């Protein structure tokens, strides 16, 4: 206990961890989601979380090869962990609007859908669906 008290809140070891599973609306609470499903995001990535947190002025860094222990899929898309500094050297908050780890997670989940990468992906998907609808043709005879 004394060892933990001796370390500064500004040490990178003391930054909070945010895994993409914490914000994923496809996950249940048992699978690792930590915010309400109504506020969660569909399949967030660690880089998106990092982009949102660094844009607001938080001190963040990305650990690409870290995996969430409850994540069964070992695909590269699901890897990553973001470390965020909440408290400064003297113990005061870095940003007053983020007093807790939950406030950071809720903010990230709110801002990720507004990222340019998210808005461009949805626009491109609509166009490809419309193009695909016009070219549907019958397959022909069934083979016996």
Swiss-Prot record:
InterPro entries: Signal_recog_particle_SRP19, SRP19-like_sf. Residues 117-144 are annotated as: Disordered. It is found in: Cytoplasm; Nucleus, Nucleolus; Nucleus, Nucleoplasm. It comes from Homo sapiens. GO terms for molecular function: 7S RNA binding; RNA binding. Residues 120-133 have a biased composition (Polar residues). GO terms for cellular component: cytosol; nuclear body; nucleolus; signal recognition particle; signal recognition particle, endoplasmic reticulum targeting. Belongs to the SRP19 family. GO terms for biological process: cotranslational protein targeting to membrane; SRP-dependent cotranslational protein targeting to membrane, signal sequence recognition. Gene3D superfamilies: Signal recognition particle, SRP19-like subunit (3.30.56.30). It holds the Pfam family SRP19. It comes from the Eukaryota. The gene is SRP19. Component of a signal recognition particle complex that consists of a 7SL RNA molecule of 300 nucleotides and 6 protein subunits: SRP72, SRP68, SRP54, SRP19, SRP14 and SRP9. Interacts with IPO5, IPO7, IPO8, KPNB1 and TNPO1. Interactions with IPO8 and TNPO1 may be involved in SRP19 import into the nucleus. Keywords: Cytoplasm, Nucleus, Ribonucleoprotein, RNA-binding, Signal recognition particle. This is Signal recognition particle 19 kDa protein. Component of the signal recognition particle (SRP) complex, a ribonucleoprotein complex that mediates the cotranslational targeting of secretory and membrane proteins to the endoplasmic reticulum (ER). Binds directly to 7SL RNA. Mediates binding of SRP54 to the SRP complex.
